[in-house]
Amino acid sequence: TIDALFLNEDRHTHNIAVLMNGKGDYAYCPIFDNGAGLLADTTMDYPLSGDVYRLMDNVQSKTICSEFDEQLDISEALYKTNLKFNFTKKDVTELLKNAEAYPKEIRNRVETIIFAQMRKYSYLFSSV
C-alpha cells in the first residue's frame, strides 16, 4: 500500500523483514528502503524534463506483479484496508518548504506526485 502511494518500484523480498526480540517474539519491521520512490531516478528512468504524469504511469511495482493497483487490490482482498494516512496537502507543502537542501524543481515535482497520489488513493486518507 505504501509503495503504491509513493511509487516505490524497488520493493522486493530482500527489503521486507520482521523483528524478533530475545524471547523469540516477532513484530512487524518498520518500512525501510524507499529510495526508489517518488521518481527518484532523475538521471535515467525519470528525467526532470519529462512529463511527470506520463512518468508516473510508467512506474512498475515488483513485489507481486508489475501494477501497483493490482498489488493493492490483492493486498486489500486478503487483508482488508488496514493502512490509513493522516497527513494533509498542507503537511506536504510545509515539509517540502523546509527541505531547502533540495532544489525547488525537485520539491515541486515531489509535491505534484504526492498530491496526485493522494487524489488517486483518497480512501486511504483520514482527511485530504
Residue spans of the language-model regions?
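Anionic ligand-binding catalytic core segments
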Residues: 2-8, 12-13, 17-128
